[in-house]
């Protein structure tokens, strides 16, 4: 799968933009704060419906405008396809595929698989569990439509159950209705746990080999799924925690409290690893993500690299560039020295200056 062109209208600092992309490496270079990351964000939003920054739709609309438009012309194999997305300040975003509106965002997932890698991805390793759950969910939602349904339903049930727990202080007679929500929480929660475990097991097998190469054979890595509650124990855990849930007015058991551990040579690197180990693990994770997508959907994803090379030493730069030379990639950077030094093929250059993009070859 490849993206052939991008069009933006009233998106962040872009009034209008049209870019024709190479199937290989597309490098967007220029000074900081010129709008390079905004282009990558637009691509990611159009493929996943979510900003990698966690931005709201209204935040991505150009100042003074009421809506923005993103259009991607893509190709899957020999089949062309167009995605149109309208972001609106006070309404739900509008999405169309080949001119036909879609009602559910989940219908868009997997049409174009994208992997986003930025310096902030180090947070997956070193920050709290919510960062790691978000990583799992964003990738699984692109790969597994059944997971999308299970996750959406689980989150809806969780929201309603927590709302009910807060109301019980005023209406204790509502407690019996918890049984209905508990049944659904367990049903969809089990599906979420099962899918996450399978995903982490597959990812873990791939990342081991990649990380050994990246570390020059010095490190072995394990990615361990750490569910709050095991799948077969979820029903009992929800039942057991009910009284405590009622006291704290929130749901204390379930996959919304899951985590992942990254263990290098027996050490949990989130707590005890050096920044170098954390960077290598983050890089291994993203390269493994690429290979897992290829394995599952039989095609490589589009790779979006946002100012990553400046954060890596020479050895890691070399490994990263060697691992992506066969994938359609969009890379942002301030200069071209790293590519020249690594003799990296630069298929198409774009110079970005204050919301204006000029193609140079």
What are these language model-derived features?
Residues 1-31, 172-302, 311, 315, ...:
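Conserved NTPase motor "head" modules and their coupling/switch loops across ABC/AAA+ ATPases, GTPases
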Residues 35-36:
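Conserved lysine of the Walker
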Residues 44:
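Helix-to-loop junction immediately C-terminal to a conserved catalytic motif
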Residues 306-308:
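Walker B catalytic acidic pair
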């Amino acid at each position: 799968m490849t993206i052939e062109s991008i069009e933006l209208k009233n998106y962040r600092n872009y009034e209008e933009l049209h870019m024709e992309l190479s199937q290989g490496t597309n490098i967007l270079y220029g000074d900081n704060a010129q709008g390079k990351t905004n282009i990558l964000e637009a691509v990611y939003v159009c493929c996943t419906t979510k900003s990698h920054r966690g931005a709201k739709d209204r935040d991505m609309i150009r100042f003074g405008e009421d809506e923005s438009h993103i259009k991607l012309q893509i190709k899957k194999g020999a089949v062309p396809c167009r995605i149109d997305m309208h972001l609106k300040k006070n309404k739900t975003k509008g999405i169309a595929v080949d001119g036909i509106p879609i009602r559910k965002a989940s219908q868009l997932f997997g049409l174009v698989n994208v992997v986003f890698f930025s310096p902030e991805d180090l947070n997956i390793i070193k920050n709290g569990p919510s960062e790691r759950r978000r990583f799992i969910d964003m990738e699984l939602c692109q790969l597994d439509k059944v997971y999308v349904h299970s996750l959406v339903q689980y989150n809806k049930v969780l929201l309603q159950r927590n709302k009910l727990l807060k109301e019980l202080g005023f209406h204790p007679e509502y407690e019996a209705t918890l049984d209905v929500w508990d049944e659904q929480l367990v049903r969809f929660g089990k599906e979420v746990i099962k899918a996450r475990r399978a995903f982490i097991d597959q990812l873990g097998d791939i990342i081991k080999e990649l990380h050994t190469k990246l570390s020059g054979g010095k490190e072995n890595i394990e990615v361990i799924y750490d569910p709050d509650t095991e799948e077969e124990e979820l029903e009992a855990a929800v039942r057991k925690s009910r009284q405590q849930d009622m006291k704290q007015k929130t749901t204390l058991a379930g996959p919304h409290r899951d985590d992942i551990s990254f263990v290098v040579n027996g050490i949990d690197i989130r707590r005890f690893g050096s920044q170098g180990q954390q960077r290598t693990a983050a890089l291994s994770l993203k390269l493994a993500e690429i290979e897992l997508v290829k394995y599952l959907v039989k095609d490589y994803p589009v790779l979006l690299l946002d100012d990553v090379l400046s954060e890596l030493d020479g050895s890691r730069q070399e490994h990263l560039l060697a691992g992506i030379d066969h994938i359609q990639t969009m890379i942002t950077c301030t200069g071209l020295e790293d590519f020249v030094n690594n003799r990296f093929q630069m298929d198409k250059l774009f110079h970005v200056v204050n919301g204006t993009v000029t193609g140079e070859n």
